[in-house]
């Protein structure tokens, strides 16, 4: 068993994120890895649990990845976006607050923005991470 308090995990600021071969700005976002376990055969974790903090107005732009993820909103309010995988057009926009769980399947383009006046937080559980470059 591995036990750790989230404040004891190193907080890393995220500035850029790749999508379709281009780097996109990530605004006001930091991440703490709470756990990383397993090996997908390429030296990367198969499972991870992360803690995100996004400042007011901060956002994670459109992106996708091989792994599945489930986010659980702890505080603040987010506008969550789903995009068409072929055209990148916005197909769904949902406001999510504390207690909301959001599942993103593998390779589904998505993003989010903190629309509250306070730092917003969520946990993000990921499975089957295949490419370190694609993990936020």
Indicate where each model-derived feature is located.
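A short, N-terminal "cap"/entry segment at the start of jelly-roll beta-barrel domains
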Residues: 1-46, 94
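Short, conserved beta-strand element in jelly-roll/cupin
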Residues: 51-55, 65-80, 84, 125-127
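Short beta-strand His + acidic residue motifs that chelate non-heme Fe in jelly-roll/DSBH
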Residues: 60-63, 80-82, 104, 110-116
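Short glycine/proline-enriched turns and hinge-like loops at secondary-structure junctions
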Residues: 45-46, 64-65, 90, 115-117
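Conserved hydrophobic/aromatic beta-strand scaffold that supports enzyme active sites
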Residues: 31-33, 49-53, 70, 93, ...
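Double-stranded beta-helix
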Residues: 2-10, 85-88, 109-136
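Short acidic-glycine-tyrosine-enriched beta hairpin
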Residues: 85-106
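Conserved short histidine dyad/triad with adjacent acidic residue
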Residues: 33-37, 48-65, 106
